[in-house]
Regions:
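Conserved beta-propeller blade repeats
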Residues: 72-90, 116-136, 146, 162-181, ...
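Extracellular/periplasmic ectodomains of large secreted or surface enzymes and adhesion receptors
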Residues: 53-66, 70, 290, 307-319, ...
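Active-site-proximal cap/loop segments of hydrolase catalytic domains
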Residues: 468-668
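Beta-propeller blade-edge and WD-like acidic-aromatic loop motif
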Residues: 48-63, 90-111, 131, 137-157, ...
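Bacterial signal peptide processing site
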Residues: 37-40
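C-terminal motif of bacterial Sec signal peptides marking the signal peptidase cleavage site
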Residues: 33-35
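N-terminal secretory signal peptides that target proteins for export/translocation
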Residues: 1-20
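Cap/lid segment of the alpha/beta-hydrolase catalytic domain
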Residues: 388-510, 517-518, 552-562
Length: 668
């Protein structure tokens, strides 16, 4: 059950819902195997010069085009076939995301879906035959349906209807059924349905009229976990008996604390969960479903990010979020003893999946200079690499490794960051720089491959990925430090980040811009509007410009955390003046620096009107503005053709306004 729980979390991430601040954060669940590329915690008292001195020496670096960067293959997802001879996964190599299958020994890919327009993602492989489950929306509108593709290739929509959103949860332990959530009855809430594996006959199991977030189902099919977001920093966990409807609160606590379910044990005796009510960081616990007594399972000086079992409980995997990287450990499911893993490829491990037999796993390796590559490991054997994702034209040595650095902000709060330094930057060859702001609020900039940032670094830009106050991964006090303060203290952290960059001898201190996606796009606009003299240029990628509109137009299926969002950002009914004060569109007359805006026309979270309005308002100032709209994208640009256009235009814009080099001109 546990791996399905993780896959559900990964799916939630794809649609912008993290376990902590669920509406906005886009947080990659990734892991680093112990001893394989895990970054040690830097000295928090290190001076900027000391931090800079640990970076690699200056060296020549070949520059690559955006076409060459995007020509690397993107892959994710991993599902073993019923006989474990093949693996199901996703790739956008055709120009949109489609589902593919390949032998676990490697070899040719077989296309399971062949869409030329809408993205398809694998949800599961059926346990006893060749059928597969996939999900698909329309042009990025996030109204996903669940489809079954038969062994004959015929596709059937299992969740027909208009304006609904459905998601696969998991198969029952006996594989006679599978579970699906859908908001077809009430667009605000997701109900739980059970489908018969053979006939697809559907039964409503849980009528969700109170806005719970649905979780895992126990192997004996008696229990369902429910989550409830009170605020972005406080949530409760419940377990409901499906036969009687009796709900038991698991999360008795005082004060603000977050509780997140981590699935049931395979014998249905224990419910595992993480909670941070005993300190700054989330620890792993379990509660007996017989007497409701709680036990601590694992704690660390960082958040326990997730934990799950193999199918029959032989193994348990746990990951901790450690300073922008996540460390994975494997345990014996019965004794709890840690199991030494065989030598695995260095780098971050993502999307680890146990086979049904518990004899092998599939996972992705991802590093700063390495996009996702799929591996299969038979326990007792050596890992087999199934994909070669990096464009062979690109020499990994020309890409850059990241470094964790810290600086003190305006009020002495220590701010963690991820730094990308171009090979060619030096005190004699100072480079322009960018402050990169993650999504959220409540996201986290992490280590790992980022094609856009590597592209910018490859073309001579220092990039500082700030984890401003309010970011996840650094304790609940730090996480809550931005509540009700957006457009103020978190923004002032970005100004302090600029000052940190100016302290580095290889940065041109007069050529520093700001860039971000989603909430990071809002921060970009806020920086240009509220701190107009600080940054030389801004790039807003589908960012909020008007909090009033955004909060009043949220999709109905966000109802379960609408009030928590109001607590975080502001209530449009009772805090209208505050939201106007913190919305850049109402202060666009103060924006005097060049601005670029990129937007998906089908974005349901930051609607296109947000970008239309800020672009029109800034143009009235006589400021250089470039606006790029993709008609077939939503909240994120998933199609390689659009990435090539969008990312390429970002570099051209930055080169013109930070380097003074027009598109197509030869750079020195």
């Amino acid at each position: 059950m546990g791996i399905l729980h993780l896959q559900r979390l990964l799916s939630m991430d794809r649609f912008g819902r993290s376990a902590l601040k669920p509406v906005w954060a886009i947080v990659l669940l990734c892991a680093v195997i112990a001893g394989c590329g895990t970054a040690s915690k830097p000295d928090e008292n290190a001076t900027p010069a000391a931090a800079a001195s640990t970076l690699p020496p200056v060296r020549p670096s070949r520059q690559y085009s955006i076409e060459q960067f995007i020509d690397s293959t993107s892959v994710n997802g991993a599902f073993f076939s019923n006989d474990e001879s093949k693996i199901l996964f996703n790739s956008n190599k055709s120009g949109v995301w489609n589902v593919y299958s390949m032998p676990i020994t490697g070899g040719a890919w077989t296309a399971v879906t062949q869409s030329a327009t809408d993205n398809n993602y694998a949800a599961a492989h059926f346990p006893d035959d060749g059928r597969v489950l996939i999900t698909r929306d329309q042009g990025g509108n996030e109204l996903t349906h669940l489809y079954v593709i038969g062994a004959d290739g015929v596709e059937t929509d299992l969740t027909p209807g208009r304006n609904l959103r459905a998601q696969f949860i998991e198969f029952s332990h006996d594989f006679k059924y599978f579970y699906v959530s859908s908001n077809e009855r009430d667009p605000r809430f997701f109900d739980l349905y059970r489908y018969a594996t053979q006939s697809y006959q559907r039964t409503l199991l849980f009528n969700n009229d109170n806005g719970y977030d649905l979780g895992s189902i126990s192997a004996d099919q008696r229990w369902l976990t429910l989550g409830k977001a009170n605020t972005t920093n406080d949530s409760d966990l419940f377990a409901v008996q499906l036969d009687s409807g009796k709900i038991t609160r698991v999360s008795d606590h005082l004060g603000q604390a977050s509780f997140q379910e981590q699935g049931f044990s395979s014998n249905s005796k224990w419910l595992y969960y993480t909670a941070n009510d005993h300190g700054e960081f989330a620890e792993l616990r379990r509660v007996s479903l017989d007497d409701w007594k709680h036990e601590s399972v694992q704690k660390a000086n960082w958040d326990v990010q997730y934990s799950y079992f193999s199918r029959n409980g032989k193994y348990r995997v746990t990951a901790t979020n450690e300073d922008g990287s996540t460390r994975v450990r494997l345990f014996d499911g019965a004794s709890g003893a840690e199991i030494a893993l065989p030598q695995l490829p260095a780098g971050e491990i993502r999307g680890l999946t146990f086979a049904r037999s518990e004899q092998r796993i599939a996972f992705y390796v991802n590093g700063d200079r390495q996009p996702n590559d799929l591996y299969v490991l038979d326990f007792g054997g050596k890992p087999r690499q199934l994909t070669q994702s990096l464009n062979p034209v690109i020499d990994p040595a020309d890409l850059v490794n990241t470094q964790v650095v810290r600086f003190e902000s305006f009020d002495k709060m220590v701010i963690p960051n991820i730094l990308w330094k171009p090979h060619q930057a030096s005190a004699q060859n100072r480079a322009p720089a960018l402050v990169w702001v993650h999504g959220g609020p409540g996201g986290q900039t992490t280590r790992g491959h980022n094609a856009l940032i590597q592209y910018l670094a490859n073309h001579g830009y220092v990039v500082l990925g700030i984890n401003n106050r309010g970011s996840s991964g650094y304790g609940k006090t730090f996480f809550a430090a931005d509540d009700g303060r957006h457009g103020r203290e978190p923004l002032w952290d970005t100004v302090a980040a600029k000052h940190y960059l100016q302290s580095l001898d290889y940065v041109d201190d007069a050529k520093i811009g700001i860039i971000g996606r989603s909430y990071g796009g809002y921060m970009t606009l806020a920086a240009l509007a509220f701190q107009p003299d600080e940054f030389a240029v801004g790039v807003d990628i589908f960012g909020v410009s008007n909090w009033l509109r955004t909060l009043e137009s949220i999709p109905p299926y966000w109802e379960s955390f609408r009030l928590a969002l109001y607590q975080e950002i502001g209530d449009p009914k009772t805090q209208r003046d505050f939201l106007i004060e913190t919305s850049p569109v109402f202060h666009a007359d103060k924006i005097t620096k060049p601005l670029m805006v990129l937007q998906g026309a089908n974005d349901p979270r930051v609607v296109k009107a947000e970008s239309d309005d800020i672009v029109a308002a800034v143009k009235k100032n006589g400021v250089a503005v470039e606006y790029v709209v993709f008609e077939d994208e939503g909240h994120g640009f998933s199609k390689p053709a659009n990435q090539i256009v969008g990312y390429g235009k970002i570099l051209e814009f930055l080169d013109l306004h930070l380097k003074g080099v027009a598109a197509g001109a030869q750079q020195p």
